[in-house]
A protein has these predicted regions:
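A conserved positional marker within WD40/Gbeta-like beta-propeller blades
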Residues: 56, 98, 118, 146, ...
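Conserved strand-to-loop turn within each blade of WD40 beta-propeller repeats
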Residues: 50-54, 92-96, 140-144, 181-185, ...
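WD40-repeat beta-propellers
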Residues: 57-60, 99-103, 124, 147-150, ...
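Loop/turn segments within WD40 beta-propeller blades
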Residues: 39-45, 82-87, 125-135, 165, ...
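Intrinsically disordered, low-complexity acidic/Ser/Thr/Pro-rich linker and tail segments
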Residues: 1-38, 222-260
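WD40/WD-repeat beta-propeller blade N-cap
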Residues: 29-36, 72-78, 96, 114-121, ...
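Structural hallmark of WD40 beta-propellers
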Residues: 46-49, 67-69, 87-91, 100, ...
Length: 404
């Protein structure tokens, strides 16, 4: 039985602006002395942050593509990072289990490291801006099988959530306040961190069906949660209340009446699409990849999903139903990461084969451009929120900026 049936995609961009595909490298930024593992643009796109094997976090200015700050203090590889949705701070966590908070304007560390996890950190998630416009709380997951809730203003751990029987590999903090965690124990758990049961938090439900560990989670609202109140061409909100209102409006528009959708990807070569707020029964099981699924991402408008696999392919699926739409072939090594343009019209993929490929949703079967230049595997990848550039980070210790 073949799952490679090709279906015509009726693509209609919902974005108010059009992103042109990136076609060339305009800058190779050096400074890291080991592999660049993590790469992320700030919500307003004005800064880029990178982290990796050299234990340093670096901030880069995206208008001049020059280094701004080098932040040292980590005592092991920087494994995961995230921006606050208002861009005020950047959080990084390492293999020793320490979490550090940085002021991107000055490059200085804010407060003391957050310690308490017994093993390395696997993921960090901020509480959404429309739930807390002051961006005070983060959740972290670890190889120690726990989730911790921290107040980054006070530096205190507010809660430790237990229940998984294996390392927690991925984490999301959803727009309704629920936390989703995927684990080596083959389950996804849905938590209410402010639950009113006897314990401070409560397990809402457990989602089962995968035959192997969960590698990746994605929400259909990831993009709007990440960018908060920032909208290209609109002035920045003047107050936290205004920011909260705009962030809520953006969230509501993307999830619509259908609600939040969660996608899980696994070592078992499959994905499941869920309505995690209301049901433990999956909407759909997504079959077709021939190897483990490494990364998944909803398009910013929530209508599509891209998945990257060790089978060297990127696949496109319907974000509402989970229906298979297209296979993007061309990479000759495992696909480590995928990223969407802000208008949901293009995808970039980074691979073990040392290339970045650009794909168009109008005709996704063949890569629009192949961007060579890295001397080794491409681990980190992000498309700037304003759509003007893509950043890639590699085992070759460089960060490359690609432009149209």
């Amino acid at each position: 039985m073949s799952f490679e049936e090709n279906i015509t995609i009726a693509y209609q961009p919902l974005s108010v602006f059009k992103v042109r595909p990136v076609t060339r490298c305009i800058e190779t930024m050096v400074g890291h002395t080991d592999a660049v593992i993590q790469l992320a643009y700030s919500p307003d796109g004005k800064r880029l942050a990178s982290g990796g094997g050299d234990m340093a976090v670096r901030f880069w200015n995206t208008s001049s593509n020059t280094p701004q700050h080098t932040c040292t203090g980590h005592r092991n590889h920087v494994l995961c990072t995230t921006w606050a949705p208002d861009g005020s701070v950047f959080v990084s966590a390492d293999k020793s289990g320490e979490i550090r908070i940085w002021d991107p304007k000055t490059g200085t560390q804010v407060g003391q490291p957050l310690t308490g996890h017994k093993k390395w950190i696997t993921a960090i998630a901020f509480e959404p801006l429309h739930l807390d416009p002051l961006c005070r709380r983060i959740a972290t997951s670890s190889n120690d099988q726990t989730i911790k809730i921290w107040n980054i203003r006070t530096g205190q751990c507010e809660d430790t959530i237990s229940g998984h029987t294996g390392s927690i590999e991925c984490l999301r903090w959803g727009g309704k306040g629920l936390i989703y965690s995927g684990s080596r124990d083959r389950t996804i758990k849905v938590w209410d961190p402010d639950g009113h049961s006897r314990s401070k938090h409560k397990l809402v439900r457990t989602l089962t069906g995968h035959g192997h560990r969960i590698n990746a989670l994605a929400l259909n609202c990831d993009y709007v949660l990440r960018t908060g109140a920032y909208v290209l061409g609109k002035p920045v909100p003047a107050s936290p209340e205004e920011a909260k209102a705009r962030a809520l409006e953006r969230y509501t528009e993307v999830v619509g009446s259908d609600g939040e959708k969660l996608l899980s990807g696994s070592d078992d070569f499959t994905m499941f699409l869920w309505h995690p707020e209301t049901s433990k029964t999956p909407v759909e099981r997504l079959l077709g990849h021939q190897n483990l699924i490494n990364h998944i991402a909803f398009s910013p408008d929530g209508r599509y999903v891209a998945s990257g696999s060790f089978d060297k392919k990127v696949k496109i699926w319907c974000g509402k139903t989970g229906r298979f739409l297209s296979t993007l072939t061309g990479h000759v090594g495992a696909v480590y990461q995928v990223a969407w343009s802000a208008d949901s019209a293009h995808i970039v993929s980074g691979s073990k084969d040392s290339t970045v490929k650009v794909w168009s949703m109008k005709d996704p079967k063949k890569a629009l451009f192949t961007l060579p230049g890295h001397a080794d595997e491409v681990y980190g990848l992000d498309w700037s929120p304003d759509g003007t550039q893509v950043a890639s980070g590699s085992k070759d210790r460089t960060v490359k900026i690609w432009h149209n």
